[in-house]
């Protein structure tokens, strides 16, 4: 018989930087999860994604055990890295802060496709391009 789920926790944690301090500690502590066990497992699993915030979904069971799923870094993080910018603009219509080529957009699509709500690469490219435009990043050929 399957274990009874008592909760699900969604967090964004910097890769290899999970530690018992907020926000990780309090979120897991409320559910009775062994915080250090999670931190060690998360840091080990994300050691090849350094420099990104990683969305994670933690499922907590009645016996205080847990499983977690890591997702791909947010599209905005991937766009910022590809465009070489620190942050987007507050006014994307007037201020352009960087440029991405269509090839770079397709690279981002390859990474993010599993997390997007489409399986079509053309549609996924439109989603990523829209996110980039919202940040003030131009898409060029």
UniProtKB/Swiss-Prot annotation:
Keywords: Methylation, Ribonucleoprotein, Ribosomal protein, RNA-binding, rRNA-binding. Gene3D superfamilies: Ribosomal protein L11, C-terminal domain, Ribosomal protein L11/L12, N-terminal domain. The keyword Ribosomal protein applies. GO terms for cellular component: cytosolic large ribosomal subunit. InterPro entries: Ribosomal_uL11, Ribosomal_uL11_bac-typ, Ribosomal_uL11_C, Ribosomal_uL11_C_sf, Ribosomal_uL11_CS, Ribosomal_uL11_N, Ribosomal_uL11_N_sf. It comes from the Bacteria. One or more lysine residues are methylated. The keyword rRNA-binding applies. GO terms for biological process: translation. Forms part of the ribosomal stalk which helps the ribosome interact with GTP-bound translation factors. HAMAP family: Ribosomal_uL11 (MF_00736). Belongs to the universal ribosomal protein uL11 family. This is Large ribosomal subunit protein uL11. It comes from Campylobacter curvus (strain 525.92).
């Amino acid at each position: 018989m399957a274990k009874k789920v008592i909760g699900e926790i969604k967090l964004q944690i910097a890769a290899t930087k999970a530690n018992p301090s907020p926000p990780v500690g309090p979120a897991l502590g409320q559910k009775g999860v062994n915080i250090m066990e999670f931190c060690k497992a998360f840091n080990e699993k994300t050691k090849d994604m350094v420099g990104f915030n990683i969305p994670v979904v933690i499922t907590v069971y009645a016996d205080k055990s847990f499983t977690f799923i890591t997702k791909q870094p947010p599209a905005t993080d991937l766009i910022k890295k590809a465009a070489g910018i620190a942050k987007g603009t507050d006014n994307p219509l007037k201020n352009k802060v960087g440029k991405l080529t269509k090839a770079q957009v397709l690279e981002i699509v390859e990474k993010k496709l599993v997390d997007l709500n489409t399986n079509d690469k053309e549609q996924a490219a439109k989603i990523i391009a829209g996110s980039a435009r919202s940040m003030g990043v131009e898409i060029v050929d």
